[in-house]
């Protein structure tokens, strides 16, 4: 399914009319003077709904993930994603087949930190591909919002250079199945690392104002693959070429003596 001529204004109108953000959530309003419209960017407040605590940027409230996915199979999902410049039907099982996976959950399109992260991962995509890692961005925005954002020049806050797909989780089912749906109705800023068998190896959550580290994400994939290949475990600050440990007491003693003595 290919869409052309999707305007930024109509896309933002669509997302604002479809996102069921709770009560008085003032989501992401910064004036885009170049386009003479308001786009989403800064959360200012959320009133208490059904006993949920008030949220403000100063509190940095994060919804607790009730159950960890680490060590379990990643939930599979289908839907619409933006791939290059086309909107396509997406199947996670097909996309991540025989590959490691990085799911980059982010709050919303047209925001501050999110485009810097997505483009940061995108410019290092070759490093992920060399490790057989496929990257996918996920948010609750509409496919039309993704497309409008992708069509917007980077100098205007867009993500036009983006090289990996953006999945549209408008139903919130994907974010919910991963335990990453915030009370405000959008996803946590979170990274999910998956091995080739579809098992979740690492989940990281970040406050809305904190951007992720691409280098740290690559280091974690190196550690996952090293442990799989050798059967060894990776100690603190491990990176490729560093000493590792066998999972036994003698190896631990030797490592600690060499490293901290």
Which residues are covered by each model-predicted region?
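Chalcogenol-based redox active-site neighborhoods
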Residues: 2-19, 25-31, 37-261
């Amino acid at each position: 399914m290919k869409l052309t001529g999707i305007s930024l204004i109509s896309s933002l109108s669509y997302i604002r009319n479809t996102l069921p953000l709770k009560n008085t959530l003032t989501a992401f309003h910064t004036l885009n003077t170049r386009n003479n419209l308001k786009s989403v960017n800064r959360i200012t407040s959320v009133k208490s709904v059904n006993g949920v605590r008030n949220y403000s940027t100063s509190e940095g409230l994060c919804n607790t993930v009730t159950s960890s996915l680490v060590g379990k199979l990643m939930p599979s999902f289908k839907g619409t994603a933006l791939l290059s410049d086309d909107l396509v039907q997406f199947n996670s099982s097909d996309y991540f087949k025989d590959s490691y996976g990085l799911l980059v959950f982010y709050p919303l399109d047209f925001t501050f930190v999110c485009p810097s992260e997505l483009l940061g991962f995108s410019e290092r995509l070759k490093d992920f591909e060399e490790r057989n890692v496929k990257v996918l961005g996920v948010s609750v925005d509409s496919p039309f919002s993704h497309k409008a954002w992708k069509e917007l020049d980077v100098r205007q806050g867009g993500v036009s250079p983006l090289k990996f797909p953006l999945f549209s989780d408008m139903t919130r089912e994907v974010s919910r199945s991963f335990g990453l749906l915030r009370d405000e109705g959008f996803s946590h800023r979170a990274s999910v690392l998956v091995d080739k068998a579809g098992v979740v190896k690492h989940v990281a959550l970040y406050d809305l104002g904190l951007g992720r580290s691409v280098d740290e994400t690559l280091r974690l994939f190196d550690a996952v693959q090293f442990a799989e290949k050798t059967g060894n475990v990776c100690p603190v600050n491990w990176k490729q070429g560093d000493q590792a440990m066998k999972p036994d007491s003698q190896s631990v003693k030797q490592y600690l003596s060499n490293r901290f003595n």
